[in-house]
Amino acid sequence: MTDWISDPQVCAAAQLLKQQAVIAYPTESVWGLGCDPGSLTAVEKLLRLKGRSLSKGLILIAANTEQFSPFLGGLEPDALRRFQTPQQKPTTWLVPNNSSAPEWISGGHDTLALRVTDHPLAAALCQLFGGPLVSTSANPQGQPAATSAEQVQGYFAQAVGVKALDFLTPGTVGGAVKPSEIRYLLSGEIVREG
């Protein structure tokens, strides 16, 4: 098993994230595009690259629940336990927005989309970066999500200037066949089957 936390390319990617870069990296089921959620410049670059609207909101991933602490304030103990309980499949929780995240992450919605990633490389990126990352599928709007590094390169190789991808990590996607399940934390209602 690769020790991604000390991999030079993953370390380089984490440093680039701190400089408003947009990177591509593998997740549990598809390749993702990621950036610093606190940087409007980086988020706008990612959205231009993908051709996605700011109003849709974005998923954040983290290496552990502690990295999401600012966004979990105000949750009832039962809801917090549900969020902290490992799931059998990748699950993105829609958590009440306590106004800790910038509006460009929430898209102006009353929830935030948060997932603790099980993918070792993605988790290492979050650890090295020091917090959550934006995570959206690596594909232009309307195209299938990339499942290989080659597909990511095919989608974004022609991009130049402000639409250019800054870095492509090593690695492969995990074993999940479908994208993460999305469900409301408080009601348990499933928005997207995983």
Whereabouts are the PLM-identified features?
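Active-site-adjacent structural elements in enzyme catalytic cores
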Residues: 1-194
